[in-house]
Amino acid sequence: MKRFFTLIAGATAAASMAALLGMSAAHAAEPAKASKPDLAAGEAKATQVCAACHAADGSRGLSANPILQGQHPQYLAKQLHEFKSAARKNAVMQGMAAPLTEDDIRNVSAFYASKQAKEGFARNKDTVALGEKIYRGGIAAKAVPACAACHSPNGAGLPAQYPRLSGQHAEYTKAQLVAFRQGDRTNNAQMATIAANLSDKEINALADYIAGLR
């Protein structure tokens, strides 16, 4: 009888140990949760690394550089990772992104995303109609889809998938579409395919129209 209870106790202990080990393995298999972005740290790093080109709050600096304020943090983080890995080519940005840690990227992206995007405006009234037509309806004859389908009718984009476009510098948008078309920017195959079918006139009209979206 004593031996029976000893066996039961041993089996119970073994089962408990197995359960404990199973729980430990399950916890070990769980991915570590990303820490919450630190906006103050993001602001400090942005001031140190980014502000000279993108302004302290990511607002309307030089038109050759993108406006960052109000951009989706997932998109900003993705671009920084791709600059860092050289998946997106830009000598200046690759140098800036290279020393950034994962926390730096998360914090800086969240900081710029937390800023309220300012409204922009279209400058060329003669091309607004063409830009609007392409943005909202695409160009069926060229298999160019409507930009609004992915970037939303008001250019707000879709977090984690498509960037915000509204209010972006026309010069920057134009430069990126041309880079996609020429194969100089290769980190988005879908955009490369679309841009390949756009003429200079269509790109200019589209970029100017996007600058005034709100």
Where do the model's predicted regions map?
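Surface-exposed interaction/gating patches
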Residues: 119, 126-161, 166
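C-terminal capping alpha-helices of c-type cytochrome domains
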Residues: 98-120, 171, 194-214
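The canonical Cys-X-X-Cys-His
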Residues: 50-56, 108, 144-153, 206
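Electrostatic cytochrome c docking/interface patches
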Residues: 26-46, 59-64, 114-140
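Bacterial N-terminal signal peptides that target proteins for export
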Residues: 1-15
